[in-house]
């Protein structure tokens, strides 16, 4: 039995410890900043709320043995909502008395446009993170397939949560859903990138995203009911909407960060396989790259603020 060569040992050590290097952390922050991570998360959260809440209402209207009142009560029971939070959920999902709950062709078409818009926002995330050419509407077929996968994953997720967990902390169900979540995330990136990301490069995103989102969802089960009830008690349905968008924003920050980290993990593993050694001034280079991205974002923000001020000053005249 031959001993492992020094090169093999070095490669193993680098594979296991690269994420501890400051340069890798700086590269990840630069990638997150390059895709405008927080702005992207806000856009995704808004798109998700615009698309998914109407989709839930539509499903309660067309699926047999499911109505909006039952769906609202299920959410209330699942998260232990009381008081203003419970009333806000009922007002948000349940139709008013005497209201026709039928689904029109125009309404269904508008809903599909909203869901497609959300899927394209996710598509732009993967295109920018992995530096791919933007396809926009040319990837519509894959977007539609992904929407079907999203509905299926949501149904499976809801079913597992319903039969496994009874309290607010859904630790067991989130652990059981890890394989399904990883598979869905890999499928999401593969479809929305028009299958341009190699499957091997999707593994870090699928695994990391599934783990981080499971941690977030477990914590959300604790703080979300308090946030929801507090906002709804103060501001009614508007407060419930703000709470939902806040929760979705945090969810999307985790998703965007997972994509940025996973992309850098894939690149780093590729460099290790090729035997490339990090340069001596790697930390300085990555720090300068991060500062350049921050300066660019600050300059863009200042230009937007100056344009806003000039517009209002001309309007006042």
Model regions: which residues?
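Membrane-embedded alpha-helices and immediately adjacent juxtamembrane helical segments
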Residues: 1-317
């Amino acid at each position: 039995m031959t001993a492992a060569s020094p090169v093999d040992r070095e490669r193993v050590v680098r594979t296991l410890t690269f994420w501890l290097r400051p340069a890798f952390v700086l590269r990840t922050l630069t990638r997150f900043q390059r895709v405008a991570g927080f702005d992207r998360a806000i856009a995704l959260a808004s798109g998700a709320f615009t698309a998914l809440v109407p989709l839930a209402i539509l499903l309660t209207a067309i699926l047999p043995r499911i109505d909006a009142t039952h769906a609202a009560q299920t959410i209330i029971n699942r998260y232990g909502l009381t008081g203003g939070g419970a009333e806000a959920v009922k007002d948000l999902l349940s139709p008013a008395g005497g209201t026709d709950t039928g689904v029109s062709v125009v309404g269904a078409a508008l809903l599909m446009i909203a869901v497609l818009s959300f899927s394209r926002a996710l598509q732009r995330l993967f295109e920018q993170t992995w530096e791919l050419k933007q396809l926009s509407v040319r990837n519509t077929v894959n977007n539609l397939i992904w929407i079907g996968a999203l509905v299926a994953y949501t149904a499976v997720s809801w079913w597992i949560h319903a039969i496994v967990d009874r309290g607010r902390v859904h630790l067991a169900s989130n652990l059981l859903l890890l394989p399904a979540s990883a598979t869905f995330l890999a499928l999401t990136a593969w479809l929305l990138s028009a299958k341009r990301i190699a499957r091997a490069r999707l593994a870090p995103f699928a695994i990391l995203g599934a783990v981080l989102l499971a941690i977030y969802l477990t914590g959300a089960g604790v703080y979300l009911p308090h946030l929801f009830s507090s906002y709804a008690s103060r501001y009614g349905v508007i407060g419930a909407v703000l709470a939902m968008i806040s929760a979705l924003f945090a969810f999307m920050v985790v998703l965007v960060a997972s994509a940025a980290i996973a992309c850098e993990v894939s690149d780093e593993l590729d460099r290790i396989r090729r035997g490339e050694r990090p340069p001596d001034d790697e930390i300085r280079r990555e720090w300068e790259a991060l500062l350049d991205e921050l300066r660019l974002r600050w300059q863009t923000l200042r230009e937007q603020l100056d344009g806003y001020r000039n517009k209002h000053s001309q309007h006042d005249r």
